Amino acid sequence: MERQVLLSEPQEAAALYRGLSRQPSLSAACLGPEVTTQYGGLYRTVHTEWTQRDLERMENIRFCRQYLVFHDGDSVVFAGPAGNSVETRGELLSRESPSGTMKAVLRKAGGTVSGEEKQFLEVWEKNRKLKSFNLSALEKHGPVYEDDCFGCLSWSHSETHLLYVAEKKRPKAESFFQTKALDISASDDEMARPKKPDQAIKGDQFVFYEDWGETMVSKSIPVLCVLDIDSGNISVLEGVPENVSPGQAFWAPGDTGVVFVGWWHEPFRLGIRYCTNRRSALYYVDLSGGKCELLSDGSLAICSPRLSPDQCRIVYLQYPCLAPHHQCSQLCLYDWYTKVTSVVVDIVPRQLGESFSGIYCSLLPLGCWSADSQRVVFDSAQRSRQDLFAVDTQTGSITSLTAAGSAGSWKLLTIDKDLMVAQFSTPSLPPSLKVGFLPPPGKEQSVSWVSLEEAEPIPGIHWGVRVLHPPPDQENVQYADLDFEAILLQPSNPPDKTQVPMVVMPHGGPHSSFVTAWMLFPAMLCKMGFAVLLVNYRGSTGFGQDSILSLPGNVGHQDVKDVQFAVEQVLQEEHFDARRVALMGGSHGGFLSCHLIGQYPETYSACIARNPVINIASMMGSTDIPDWCMVETGFPYSNSCLPDLNVWEEMLDKSPIKYIPQVKTPVLLMLGQEDRRVPFKQGMEYYRALKARNVPVRLLLYPKSNHALSEVEAESDSFMNAVLWLHTHLGS
């Protein structure tokens, strides 16, 4: 039997972390053009991009690796790597041209200070760099957006132009008392006159530019930019409505214009990261006349428009606006030539039996269409696993491509000419890279997957999914008969199960979910001898829209009781050590952790909370998501809303700060000083309240970290401190 790492051995825990943190994560994949060999065979290259933690450099490194896939048109004959991995430094975005003969790369270079960094747009062809444009020196716009909310890098169908999104060039500003430099080369008559630089606006040095919140702090006014590759000329497109911010753009059929998503930014911007409910619509701007046309319903929220291979139709995801941040979405289809919009897949109120429970992905892959432009492939959470699906856009029929396969979760990276590139993982298996052809309509369940990169299972981890039904007194009257699930990881064959401690992890959001995929922290804790319980309480995504809608107005109550019920059920059935149960959660998971130690103080011996929501009322005026505070408390949100005393009272009543007098569990707080989502003063408020009551508490403040605490230095330090906290308060 494999030896478990004991709680009393932090050095071994550090060594274990060093080993498991080397597991890389897939971030992107693209398929090269189809090549015919001299013998008539067909093959394609698969270019993959990965990220990996580097503890020596304390950063996430990026690298690429290529593979060859030989096929006969509808099945893979042979597949394997074509060389070793190579680190890619400075690449922000890259995109193959439609023919596959060229590649565009957005690269940063220069100093480590942000003001010294320059951005270059490169065009590569075969074995040479064909063009390189210093975008920073050209001064047509500000920094290019490389994020997946607004950012894009799109080739025109003619492969002569590149489309991207950048920050609008800001006017120069100066003090009212700015001294002008004199031109010493001028004539005597000109000596007394100052030089004439670009006209600067006096007194605008400190004008506030509102940004898009968490992880988007430097992004305020995006503009659409077009680079003419031959001439090097850059144009900032006119015609975009003044009240929207453009992004996720691509070329319209025939290169006649540009299609983009426009997000409303009036009267002010709300945080957009992790929020699919921001009011937005699909637009088309004509390049010849600059006329802009609205293509979708302007009262909703949309994202991920994707043009079909035949350039006739566009699919996109559509959500209700200013409601819960993430919900079940519609898949909509816009016909370019008839101008008709239809709903292909509608919102699913609740899952019936083993049927489809709805679409919950926040983005469609850039490549998601079948070769015949009839079907769309995507991944989505279905209860506590993530599967791949194909939907027929004509009939709306949905078929799972992976439900009949191994337990675990899938992610679609791309599909092109029906060749799919996907990732598969489980809680005990790091990500594997697989390829397979999309079968003909009606036979979608018969995909034959071939591994390009197979990961080794992590021994010593046993996992499963528990279905839980709330007791009658905890039913939601409006949304009755909802169940929920929890994923349980536990050490394989422990010497004495009654001595196994348990860490309970509720997820954040609250409208997100855990799926049966690889996660570093739960795997690490399980290897150290803990059972780990990941709870998808009612309100989680993947269980139908009714489950999501059951939670707003009931936070701090329904979700808390669901987690506690799951804990009690698992302790009763598995006989783990009930005296050694700990909580670990971030954001809304931290909110629940702090609630649980206040409402059920006898159950938990330690608590670790990362950037937790502590006081909804005090967070309302400082967060980038004030709508969250209103909606989750149970009130409608509008940009002009002013909470009254009743609203403030409800916010306090649903906050963990209410239960401070009952708390006796030792608490470790981990806060990111740059967190715009749940400002670190939330955790400070809890810290001071606990200190005043002599409850054991420790606070770690990471000065350069934001809400996710995902930087390598913060993540590694927070994990080791969590291990030490568990060792101290649970014992070995």
Curated annotation (Swiss-Prot):
It is found in: Cytoplasm. Homotetramerization is required for activity. Tetramerization results in the formation of a gated channel which is involved in substrate selection and substrate access to the catalytic sites. Its EC number is 3.4.19.1. InterPro entries: 6-blade_b-propeller_TolB-like, AARE_N, AB_hydrolase_fold, Pept_S9_AS, Peptidase_S9_cat. The lineage of its organism: Eukaryota, Metazoa, Chordata, Craniata, Vertebrata. Belongs to the peptidase S9C family. This enzyme catalyzes the hydrolysis of the N-terminal peptide bond of an N-acetylated peptide to generate an N-acetylated amino acid and a peptide with a free N-terminus. It preferentially cleaves off Ac-Ala, Ac-Met and Ac-Ser. Also, involved in the degradation of oxidized and glycated proteins. Homotetramer. One of its GO terms (biological process) is amyloid-beta metabolic process. The modification N-acetylmethionine is found at residue 1. The active site is at residues 587, 675, 707. The modification Blocked amino end (Met) is found at residue 1. The keyword Hydrolase applies. The modification Phosphoserine is found at residues 185, 187. Pfam families: APEH_N, Peptidase_S9. One of its GO terms (molecular function) is serine-type endopeptidase activity. The keyword Phosphoprotein applies. It comes from the Eukaryota. It catalyses: Cleavage of an N-acetyl or N-formyl amino acid from the N-terminus of a polypeptide. It comes from Rattus norvegicus (Rat). Keywords: Acetylation, Cytoplasm, Hydrolase, Phosphoprotein. GO terms for cellular component: cytoplasm. This is Acylamino-acid-releasing enzyme. SUPFAM superfamilies: alpha/beta-Hydrolases, Peptidase/esterase 'gauge' domain. The gene is Apeh. PROSITE patterns: PRO_ENDOPEP_SER.
